[in-house]
Amino acid sequence: MIPYRLCRKSDYPISSYPNFIKEDGDMDNEIIIDKGCGLDVHKETVVACVMGSGIKKEIRTFSTKTNDLLRLKTWLSGLGITHIAMESTGPYWKPVFNVLEDGFTLILANARHIKNVPGRKTDVKDSEWICRLLRSGLLSASFVPPQGIRELRDLTRYRRKLTQALSAEKNRIQKVLEDANVKISSVLSDTFGVSGSQMIEAIMEGKLSESEIADLAKGKLKSKKGEIREALVGYFQDHHRFMIRASLEHIKHLEKQIEDLDRETKKKLAQYQKEYELLQTIPGVKEQGAAAIIAEIGVDMDIFPSEGHLSSWAGMSPGNNESAGKKKAERRPTAIRI
């Protein structure tokens, strides 16, 4: 993808928008991009509007199947289109972006920014309006990292989901133990540590007495054998055994998936090894944290004009929406979770 640095929201503040738009909703003659295309992306279709010097305004509809997207790409290339803009509509923009990113300057615009620009007439199609805003330089490009970073982001985000699922299964087991009145979680600091895991397996097999299971305690837990023995006395039924067995099998599956993801993540990080190691010199940032940081913000900090822009994009900078002493409510972006 050609790097996009031409049209930034900061270059054209809201106060200057009326200079580009007439009262009837049409743009005036101040054009920044000569030949552009606006895309209105849906789940099944993409509506494309092309405008520019030497080009008659035309609107065509394509399906989102790969072959049709390739025909869209060929059509735009033949017209000499240089810039393409689209809204960030759920996951639907991604396959379109992937097909078109080679050879064009792509602008993924926030739908709220497009909506907030004044002057739109009701009969103007979405794709045409996006194209007009694009050519007048009124669109702010969202940060879309390179393909390698996007793939790394998929891995780290999926790992976080699996880790959450793993924690949920462990909590589920503890609830089942509580339901059976087995209180080992109140004695063991880590129910799923070495000692705790062996005790749970022994409970599942049902062959050992409470005293024999308590003897599985290791390290400092040996001094708590009496407490453990008392905590193991409960009302454990076959139903509890079935529920815990199902959760344990799921835990093993999740742990295997996480191991596979970690191996694939290390492969993706090989080209960013210098940045990966540098991030780990920050106190509190370890391997997973460093991988997540690279996956979310990339390694090219030129994308962000300042540290303030980066913190704002990450959802970690509070807004300052106040006028005449009154604060205006506005939906804030969700902070990135590392």
Task: Specify the residue positions occupied by each region the protein language model found.
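A detector of single, family-specific signature residues
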Residues: 1-338
